A protein has these predicted regions:
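Acidic, metal-coordinating helix/loop segments flanking the phosphotransfer/catalytic sites
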Residues: 30-48
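C-terminal output helix
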Residues: 106-115
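Active-site residues of response regulator receiver
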Residues: 52-54
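Short amphipathic alpha-helix used as the core "switch/output" element in two-component signaling
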Residues: 39, 61-74
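Alpha4 helix (beta4-alpha4-beta5 surface) of REC/receiver domains from two-component response regulators
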Residues: 62, 84-100, 113
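Two-component/phosphorelay signaling modules centered on CheY-like receiver
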Residues: 11-29
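The feature encodes the CheY-like receiver
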Residues: 56, 86, 105
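Hydrophobic/aromatic residues positioned on beta-strands within the core alpha/beta folds
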Residues: 80-81
Length: 122
């Protein structure tokens, strides 16, 4: 079973993602802040982490780097979620270790297609 974490201050975004992705092959957890995400990753590292590009408590690239440090040799697939295509933010996230980006708001087909493209997706 694959594990995914959505890190987003918006409870609506987290709940929509959880509703779309949760199933027999995927468990979805939620974190409302970067610090919450780090604590959860230290306890159990997910296979996929989706990081909001505009968290209030820490910049997304910093969170991405810290998750990769905690993960060690088995880092998760990491996506940054943005409300618009921001090449600068995408490049900073990729340099920090992100594998791609996800635009929000998203719908079921968009989210499922993005997850199918990930090597760990079920």
């Amino acid at each position: 079973m694959k594990r995914c974490m959505f890190v987003d201050e918006s409870s609506v975004i987290r709940k929509v993602a959880k509703r779309i992705l949760s199933g027999p092959d995927m468990v979805v957890t939620e974190a409302a802040s970067g610090q919450d995400a780090l604590e959860m990753c230290a306890f159990e590292m997910p296979d996929v982490v989706v990081v909001d590009g505009s968290l209030a408590d820490m910049p997304a690239p910093e969170l991405i780097r810290r998750i990769r440090t905690i993960a060690g040799k088995m880092p998760p697939q990491i996506l940054i979620s943005l409300v618009e295509v921001d090449i600068g933010a995408i490049m900073r996230a990729k340099r920090a270790g992100a594998h791609g980006y996800l635009l929000k708001p998203f719908n079921r087909p968009q989210l499922l297609e993005r997850f199918r493209a990930l090597p760990v997706a079920a």
